[in-house]
A protein has these predicted regions:
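Short beta-strand edge/turn micro-motifs at domain boundaries
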Residues: 100-121
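Residue-level signal for well-ordered, solvent-exposed loop/turn and beta-edge residues enriched
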Residues: 32, 95, 111-113
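A solvent-exposed, acidic/Ser-Thr-rich amphipathic alpha-helical stretch
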Residues: 20, 24-73, 77
């Protein structure tokens, strides 16, 4: 698949609320996933499919998604970006927050080799 095809499919899946399948389908075995700030007690850098999946499972378990929108993708060479806008409730505190995030994906050999997440300041 081309970078554009991967990008389009990832966005289409996320727009349905499916944030798990894109990783299963497109992460390289040695994917590197970098958060702007790591989850509490966790490293902001996850290395490998299992670590990236564990981070996603933690996030899904810690938040309730009230609404989400996904924009993009925007493709440039072997990379693309996607904008995620989410209204979530933190399960532990009950606090509601709006998150605006840009994800930058780098593709190598038809797989996501790296993903970086950027948050609004």
């Amino acid at each position: 698949m081309t970078v554009n095809e991967i990008a389009q499919d990832l966005v289409a899946l996320c727009k349905t609320g499916d944030f798990e399948t894109p990783g299963q389908k497109y992460w390289a075995d040695d994917v590197v996933s970098v958060e702007a700030g790591g989850p509490p007690g966790m490293d902001p850098v996850s290395r490998g499919k299992a670590a990236a999946a564990a981070k996603g499972e933690w996030w899904a378990g810690a938040h309730t998604i009230n609404s989400t929108s996904v924009d993009g993708p925007w493709v440039n060479g072997d990379q693309f970006t996607v904008r995620f806008h989410m209204d979530v409730t933190v399960k532990e505190s009950g606090q509601r927050q709006v998150m605006d995030e840009i994800a930058l994906y780098t593709i190598k050999n038809g797989k996501i080799a790296e993903e970086r997440f950027f948050y609004g300041a």
